[in-house]
């Protein structure tokens, strides 16, 4: 039988000789070739079982890491291009892969678990999967077990996400020092497609009876990712004006903007609460080990004006502010090692006793998603998976982008890259680039 179970005379994709467990194991191994992986566990197996049929697990496990065309999938699966297209279209309709249009037609890419297909599954109400069961499994995997969250947020120096400061609280001095890519409004202005979806985090918590009352339809995606999700009904298309109105709504609800940790080509901005969203929960759970990259700002309290009302303490989404007593005096203290620099506390101080200052340390942001992926892969010892993808012929453009990112690395990272790849070709490239 083929992908959807219909018998055909022509060559089709069969699964009778492989057990379901092996299929999901192969899929798990494929997922973990990418820096943003998912540590094995019985819970992960159950999650994959909800999201993928056995046939889908087998097929997706064979797909390359880099973007690919339908002819690549057809060759891997040994089927016709029309059959491969039908399968890929079905996978895209479930947001298990993304379909992206360019000047050569349609290409496909398998997103990582997060930010990726884990979230997509809960970004709209669905009846084709058991979302309550899935939410319970997610809660077990991310909130009870620790391996996934530690791997996602703490296994690399380079972070997957970064925080955007609340622009409405910036002073004139702040406005001078903030860069365009540090502004959520700039990301919105530069986007060609904008999609709005249900907040995966709060939707998940809703199914386990732990959701807060923060806005639900406020998750933002951009450009090719947004267009794919819109076309497959996982997001609704909005214009820049409406997106900025939603951003303002997020500010008013003390939500923290967490987006992709890149300067160009940001694909998502989540509006995170402190009770439901993984990054904020992790920030509270693991102390000063930042799960996402901070902003370049840090709040500073003017203690002469502060009335110690505690509104900033209540508003802080990661419990980085507290009331302390020293030498018989009580005052408000910000834990700067924990603080993300989001600006929520500034917004909630009606006495104007808190203002944002520039951090002393320089915040380094990867240029784009390829640069970030290369850095994360080097730090996890997985760079070879990005370069040598045995499941398909490498795309020259993707290879060129990866090598270009490597050539721009600092010397220490270049050495790590060279050691991991053990490539004479890469060594030659690096030596030529350093001259």
PLM regions: where:
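Short acidic, hydrophobic short linear motifs in intrinsically disordered regions
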Residues: 66-77
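Short amphipathic alpha-helical interaction segments
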Residues: 77-93
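A short, conserved structural fragment
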Residues: 92-103, 321-322, 354-355
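Glycine-centered, phosphate/nucleic-acid-interacting loop/turn motifs that mediate DNA/RNA or nucleotide
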Residues: 95, 254, 310, 319, ...
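Short, amphipathic alpha-helical interaction segments positioned at domain boundaries
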Residues: 105-144
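Ferredoxin-like iron-sulfur electron-transfer modules
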Residues: 108, 258-264, 268, 286-315, ...
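Catalytic cores of enzyme domains
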Residues: 144-298
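Flanking helices and flexible, charged tails adjoining ferredoxin-like Fe-S electron-transfer domains
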Residues: 336-435
């Amino acid at each position: 039988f083929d992908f959807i179970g219909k018998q055909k005379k022509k060559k089709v994709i069969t699964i009778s000789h492989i057990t379901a467990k092996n299929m999901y194991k192969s899929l798990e191994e494929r997922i973990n070739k990418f820096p943003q992986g998912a540590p094995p566990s019985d819970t992960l197996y159950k999650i994959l079982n909800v999201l993928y049929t056995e046939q889908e697990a087998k097929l997706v496990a064979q797909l390359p890491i880099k973007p690919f065309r339908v002819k690549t999938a057809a060759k891997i699966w040994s089927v016709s291009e029309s059959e491969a297209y039908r399968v890929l279209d079905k996978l895209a309709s479930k947001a298990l892969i993304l379909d992206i249009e360019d000047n050569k037609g349609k290409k496909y890419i398998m997103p990582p678990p997060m930010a990726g297909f884990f979230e997509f599954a809960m970004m709209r109400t669905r009846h084709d999967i058991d979302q309550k069961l899935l939410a319970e499994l997610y809660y077990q995997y991310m909130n009870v077990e620790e391996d996934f969250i530690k791997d996602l947020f703490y296994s690399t120096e380079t972070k997957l996400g970064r925080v955007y400061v609340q622009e409405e609280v910036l002073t004139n001095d702040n406005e001078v020092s903030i860069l365009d890519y540090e502004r959520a409004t700039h990301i919105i202005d530069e986007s060609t497609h904008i999609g709005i979806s249900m907040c995966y985090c709060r939707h998940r918590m809703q199914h386990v009876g732990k959701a807060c009352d923060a806005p639900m339809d406020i998750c933002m995606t951009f450009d090719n990712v947004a267009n794919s999700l819109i076309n497959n009904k996982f997001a609704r298309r909005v214009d820049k004006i409406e997106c900025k109105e939603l951003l303002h709504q997020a500010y008013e609800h003390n939500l923290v903007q967490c987006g992709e940790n890149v300067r160009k080509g940001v694909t998502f901005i989540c509006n995170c609460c402190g009770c439901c969203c993984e990054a904020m929960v992790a920030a509270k759970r693991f102390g000063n080990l930042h799960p996402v990259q901070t902003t370049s700002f840090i709040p500073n309290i003017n203690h002469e004006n502060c009335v110690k009302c505690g509104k900033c303490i209540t508003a802080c989404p990661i419990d980085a502010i507290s009331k302390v007593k020293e030498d018989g005096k009580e005052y408000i203290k910000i834990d700067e090692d924990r603080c993300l620099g989001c600006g929520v506390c500034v917004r909630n101080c009606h006495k104007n006793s808190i203002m944002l200052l520039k951090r002393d340390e320089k915040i380094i942001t990867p240029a784009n998603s390829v640069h970030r992926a290369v850095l994360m892969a080097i730090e996890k010892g997985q760079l070879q998976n990005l370069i040598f993808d045995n499941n398909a012929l490498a795309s020259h453009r993707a290879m060129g982008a990866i090598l270009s990112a490597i050539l721009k690395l600092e010397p220490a990272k270049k050495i790590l890259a060279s050691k991991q790849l053990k490539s004479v070709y890469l060594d030659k490239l690096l030596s030529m680039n350093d001259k």
